[in-house]
Amino acid sequence: MTNYREIAWQGLWKNNPGLVQRLGLCPLLAVTTTLTNALGLGIATMLVLIGSNVLISLVRDYVPKEIRIPVFVMIIAALVTAVQLLVNAYAYGLYMSLGIFLPLIVTNCIIIGRAEAFASRNNAFSSAFDGLMMGLGFTLVLVLLGATREILGQGTLFDGADQLLGPWAKALTFQVWQVDTSFLLAMLPPGAFIVMGLLIALKNVIDKKLRERQPETAVQPSVARARITKVS
């Protein structure tokens, strides 16, 4: 029986794609200059994860093991193309901001990794839930990273939200503080590495605190047993 609570815990925290597996670092560090870009890329990746997991789970019994990886990549590429066309049609500003990193979702190790490790071995519903949780976990890291870098670098939050949500979302842009010039380090990849390292360190500290709160299991002393080899 599928343990959905464990799947959620693995995707959101214990085996988080960004903080634990360190997968998808290229778009994670390059695109997260603003919260809008981070959220847009996270949603796109999550949609591809869910779709690819479901489709691969449905065809897993019909694909020979020898060619499964090329077939998986073709399915993922088709879904990424569909998502790319949708973003191009309905969020063109975001499409231009994400640039090459949107089609590069095809090469994201998170997606092919979940296809091989989970979707190819489980039913469609469980695979969809796994894709959702892994996608949410990755999106949360993107959002935290994007929000932190935007606040430190520009002093704003959700700048350019209209590119993702439409003209009405301009009202969502929030000025945290007024800056005369942007903090360049936070907007460049070195700043992304620093913030990412701090997020990973924070997670490790929280994990350590959680382990310390867990009651220690008492170890039962082993009892030596006499072995009778001969009865006189």
UniProtKB/Swiss-Prot annotation:
Biological role: Part of a membrane-bound complex that couples electron transfer with translocation of ions across the membrane.
GO cellular component, as recorded: plasma membrane
Alphabetically ordered keywords of this record: Cell inner membrane, Cell membrane, Electron transport, Membrane, Translocase, Transmembrane, Transmembrane helix, Transport
Family per similarity comment: Belongs to the NqrDE/RnfAE family.
Record's subcellular location: Cell inner membrane
GO BP annotations, alphabetical order: electron transport chain
Membrane as UniProt keyword: yes
The UniProt record lists the keyword Protein biosynthesis: no
Organism listed in the record: Shewanella oneidensis (strain ATCC 700550 / JCM 31522 / CIP 106686 / LMG 19005 / NCIMB 14063 / MR-1)
Annotated protein name in UniProt: Ion-translocating oxidoreductase complex subunit E
EC top class named in words: translocase
TM annotation in the entry: 39-59, 69-89, 93-113, 128-148, 182-202
Protein topology in the membrane: Multi-pass membrane protein
Record-listed E.C. numbers: 7.-.-.-
UniProt subunit comment: The complex is composed of six subunits: RnfA, RnfB, RnfC, RnfD, RnfE and RnfG.
Pfam families: Rnf-Nqr
